[in-house]
């Protein structure tokens, strides 16, 4: 699976802002109903990232046998396909079904680029995944396909058991074997890219912070400067005081973390499922577990993410596309998705099937996902990433105290939303 597509929510940041502005600048597609008749449909086109090719090829055979409809597969840059969806809808040159990260679903739907999707009983959704495909207007624009969450990787050659609490991690930091060469008093026992807001949000939210109110749908209610956020930021700063200076590099910290872990100099890190293959290739004897509980005893409430099946607005036959989406999110096809891609199914029955395979990464993601908060999928989220990154850097580097950094970030977020969205 393309790591670029898998970790889209984690790394889009300003890229998300640019793509959303591209969509916003395009003319909204006329809100006309697609043809609902499907009796004459003999072929459907699905557009996906190259990593889903073998999965679609297998389930397409079953669908052709069941429905008598041929499924034509097109592969390419899935994110790029979403970026030009506004133009493709205007020309009518769109696939019948495609895939989108959850954080793109609500904004594209609200902007008129996606058709509404009905969630069938066979989809077996839960509250979190349903929220991830529901826009601020209350309409559903995608069918949940995959779930993702940050997890903890740990080196089994360095620690016998997975750390359970942040107190455990603090104790590891006292061990001299994790001392960072060249910087006295600095440790790499535990590392996390906490100037990246996607990675840090679980720390802040676990202390009571939130991005937007009403489950991420109310952009007028911003909770990144409340008391819980300040507690979380200050806790992050306490770690930066222990970490090498390079951890403050907002562009290079991720590479530093990966290198230290792969070289056996770091016992535990927080990262996403997309990093597992790199650790396998580096022959790290690693384990995967849920992220340790915070000092306040609460869970690390990371963003819940993943991908959904969506239907472009300009499809010629909405009913036929909907039927294929229903087929894709049903339990049996979701089981095949896991077997072919090792990505965690959104369907709760298929998720249980995946958990039964006793794979550490799968189990950790499923357990961690239960404690996640939906990544806001409204367009205004594009105004959050850069100010939040600056907030974290300013605080952990000591350029501002946590309260000032948070207040400044919220002020900038509000100003940006007002400028770009008129709110």
From Swiss-Prot:
Gene3D superfamilies recorded: Periplasmic binding protein-like II
GO terms classed as biological process: maltodextrin transmembrane transport; maltose transport
Keyword flag ATP-binding: no
Effect of a null allele: Grows readily on glucose and maltotriose, but is not able to grow on glycogen. Deletion mutant is still able to depolymerize glycogen to some extent resulting in alpha-glucooligosaccharides increasing in size from maltotetraose to maltooctaose and larger oligosaccharides.
Binding site for substrate: 52, 77, 83, 103-104, 148, 193, 196, 251-254, 274, 307
Single annotated GO MF: maltoheptaose binding
Main location: membrane
Keyword annotations from UniProtKB, A to Z: Cell membrane, Lipoprotein, Membrane, Palmitate, Signal, Sugar transport, Transport
InterPro entries, per database record: Maltose/Cyclodextrin-bd, SBP, SBP_1_CS
Lipidation (N-palmitoyl cysteine): 25
Induction notes from the record: By maltose.
Lipid-substituted positions (S-diacylglycerol cysteine): 25
Signal peptide as annotated in the record: 1-24
Mode of membrane association: Lipid-anchor
PANTHER family per the UniProt record, alphabetical: MALTOSE-BINDING PERIPLASMIC PROTEIN, MALTOSE_MALTODEXTRIN-BINDING PERIPLASMIC PROTEIN
Family designation: Belongs to the bacterial solute-binding protein 1 family.
Task performed by this protein: Part of an ABC transporter complex involved in the uptake of maltodextrins. Binds glycogen-derived linear maltooligosaccharides increasing in size from maltotriose to maltooctaose with the highest affinity for maltotriose. Has a very weak affinity for maltose. Has also a very low affinity for maltotetraitol, indicating that the binding is selective for maltooligosaccharides with an intact reducing end.
Protein name, UniProt field: Maltooligosaccharide ABC transporter solute-binding lipoprotein
Annotated source species: Streptococcus pneumoniae serotype 4 (strain ATCC BAA-334 / TIGR4)
Lineage summary: Bacteria, Bacillati, Bacillota, Bacilli, Lactobacillales
């Amino acid at each position: 699976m393309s790591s670029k597509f898998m970790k889209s929510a984690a790394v889009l940041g300003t890229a998300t802002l640019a793509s959303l502005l591209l969509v916003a600048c395009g003319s909204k597609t006329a809100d006309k109903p697609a043809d609902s008749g499907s009796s004459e449909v003999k072929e459907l086109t699905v557009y996906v990232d190259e990593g889903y090719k073998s999965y679609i090829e297998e389930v397409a055979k079953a669908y052709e046998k069941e429905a008598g409809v041929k499924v034509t597969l097109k592969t390419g840059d899935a994110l790029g396909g979403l970026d030009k969806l506004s133009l493709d809808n205007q020309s009518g040159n769109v696939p019948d079904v495609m895939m989108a990260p959850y954080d793109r679903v609500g904004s594209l739907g609200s902007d008129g680029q996606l058709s509404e999707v009905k969630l069938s009983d066979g989809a077996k959704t839960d509250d979190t995944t349903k929220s991830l495909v529901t826009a601020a207007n209350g309409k559903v624009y995608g069918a949940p396909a995959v779930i993702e969450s940050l997890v903890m990787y740990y080196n089994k050659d360095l620690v016998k058991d997975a750390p359970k609490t942040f107190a455990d991690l603090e104790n590891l930091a006292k061990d001299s074997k994790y001392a960072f060469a060249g910087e006295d008093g600095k440790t790499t026992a535990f590392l996390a890219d906490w100037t990246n807001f996607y990675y840090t949000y679980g720390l802040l939210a676990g202390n009571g912070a939130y991005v937007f109110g009403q489950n991420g749908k109310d952009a007028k209610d911003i909770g990144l400067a409340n008391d819980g956020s300040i507690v979380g930021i200050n806790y992050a700063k306490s770690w930066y005081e222990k970490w090498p200076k390079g951890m403050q590099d907002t562009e290079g910290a991720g590479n530093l973390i990966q290198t230290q872990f792969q070289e056996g100099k770091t016992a535990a890190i927080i990262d996403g499922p997309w990093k597992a293959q790199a650790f396998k290739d580096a022959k790290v004897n690693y384990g995967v577990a849920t992220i340790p509980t915070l000092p306040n005893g609460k869970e690390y409430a990371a963003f819940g993410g993943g991908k959904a099946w969506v239907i472009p607005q300009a499809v010629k036959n909405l009913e036929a596309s909907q039927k294929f989406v229903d087929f894709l999110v049903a339990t049996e096809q979701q089981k095949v998705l896991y077997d072919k891609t090792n990505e965690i199914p959104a369907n709760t029955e298929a998720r249980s099937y995946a958990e039964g395979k006793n794979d550490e990464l799968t189990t950790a993601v499923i357990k961690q996902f239960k404690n996640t908060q939906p990544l806001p999928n409204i367009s205004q989220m594009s105004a959050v990433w850069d100010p939040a990154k600056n907030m974290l850097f300013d605080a952990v580097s000591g350029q501002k105290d946590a309260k000032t950094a948070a207040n400044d970030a919220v002020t900038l977020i509000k100003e940006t939303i007002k400028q770009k969205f008129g709110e």
